[in-house]
Amino acid sequence: MTNENNNDSEFAELKIRGKIFKLPILKASIGEDVIDISRVSAEADCFTYDPGFMSTASCQSTITYIDGDKGILRHRGYDIKDLAEKSDFLEVAYLLIYGELPSGEQYNNFTKQVAHHSLVNERLHYLFQTFCSSSHPMAIMLAAVGSLSAFYPDLLNFKEADYELTAIRMIAKIPTIAAMSYKYSIGQPFIYPDNSLDFTENFLHMMFATPCTKYTVNPIIKNALNKIFILHADHEQNASTSTVRIAGSSGANPFACISTGIASLWGPAHGGANEAVINMLKEIGSSEYIPKYIAKAKDKNDPFRLMGFGHRVYKNYDPRAAVLKETCKEVLKELGQLDNNPLLQIAIELEAIALKDEYFIERKLYPNVDFYSGIIYKAMGIPSQMFTVLFAIARTVGWMAQWKEMHEDPEQKISRPRQLYTGYVHREYKGIRER
């Protein structure tokens, strides 16, 4: 991938053991420029050290831009707030995958294709039956998505012509598998997709309908879930997206790649944070105890952590959190819980107190996307073990867009991070009787 804004006349100088190396500065279209260190190891006989890759750009991308200091998130140049308020999830999916918003005809064709591919092979039901009833839905979904490669053996050796159809299949089937995982975990029959419903309605239908009870989708709930899906669709090179790219760099089939993303997302520091927020609000219990827990959060010797505040990238108010705060109020008002939902009251007061506290101001700890999403899910009747599953439904769009972009990038190679070795230099082996 070539950045047209790169200027080969700009260099950074790096001095190593008395020798100066000139490193090209690659110009970003917006945001931070990047120093190209790709030749340092070959020319200077050393590597760079960056735990957590916080100062490392692993790729060039045109999909998502974040300015953490200003609280900006854009997909293909469009502000996330505009997309959340004016677009719908499948339109954003099209934007991420193809790079442009669709025309009316393109949108209709895309949504029809997604609906057409929402069914999964009937034999997948046997896989679900191998899990015990107490299995976490994420465990079931992780296995089910990985198993899709068995049903599409032609994609074990995929070609460029397969990229778009693969993305559509994945976007279509993930909600079906997610709903099946939930239904199995609670012992209810699976509900098949209904192609007369749109993407979000269909998922709610598969989640909450039963063979003997039709589920009527509340438009406020549908709109809220649509926003949540959009807000979680992509977020640049985070842990799960990087995992998908690393797996994809080896040439692994797309179903295997997405399953690695799901595994990474399952980690409590990544996709499980909104569930942790709910547990924290329950632990606080009442607004009167907020000062006590604020003090605990400041005490470095106290294990308590204020969940839903702070972000590895954002040093300002997370723009997704601002949308979700208002969405949360809309949902609770519709459900008659706006004035009597204890979790919301604690959350609002906790946010207000924290944003005025110098400790949090100095450390730039603002509410993030996880702070209000769990409250919305809980009000919708979605159990906490499904929170990360819904995150995976939304993020699959970003994963597939990033996977497609990676394979279209001629500069990409198989990922191979290096290390700073600090172990033993050399030891002689001794037999077990001599140790």
From Swiss-Prot:
Keywords: Transferase, Tricarboxylic acid cycle. The active site is at H311, D370. One of its GO terms (molecular function) is citrate (Si)-synthase activity. CDD domains: EcCS_like (cd06114). Its EC number is 2.3.3.16. One of its GO terms (biological process) is tricarboxylic acid cycle. Pathway: Carbohydrate metabolism; tricarboxylic acid cycle; isocitrate from oxaloacetate: step 1/2. It holds the Pfam family Citrate_synt. It catalyses: oxaloacetate + acetyl-CoA + H2O = citrate + CoA + H(+). It comes from the Bacteria. GO terms for cellular component: cytoplasm. Belongs to the citrate synthase family. Citrate synthase is found in nearly all cells capable of oxidative metabolism. This is Citrate synthase. It comes from Rickettsia slovaca (strain 13-B).
